[in-house]
């Protein structure tokens, strides 16, 4: 389950990067990226 969360997070980051490539920088995409990274750190901290 923890690995599944991390995988979903990585997919989110890839989607954000792809979004940036096609639409340029967007504050919303940046925010999602930060939230995702924070979630990854939290999962690592828990384990």
Swiss-Prot record:
Residues 1-24 form the signal peptide. Keywords: Secreted, Signal. One of its GO terms (cellular component) is extracellular region. It comes from the Eukaryota. Expressed in Peyer patches, spleen, thymus, liver and mesenteric lymph node. Expressed at high levels by dendritic cells, and at lower levels by T-cells, monocytes and B-cells. InterPro entries: IGIP (IPR038815). Its main location: secreted. The keyword Signal applies. Induction: By CD40 stimulation in dendritic cells (at protein level). Disulfide bonds: none annotated. It is found in: Secreted. Enhances IgA secretion from B-cells stimulated via CD40. This is IgA-inducing protein. It comes from Bos taurus. The gene is IGIP.
């Amino acid at each position: 389950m923890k690995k599944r969360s991390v995988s979903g997070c990585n997919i989110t980051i890839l989607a954000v990067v792809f979004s940036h490539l096609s639409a340029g920088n967007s504050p919303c995409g940046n925010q999602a990226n930060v939230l995702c990274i924070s979630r990854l750190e939290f999962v690592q901290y828990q384990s």
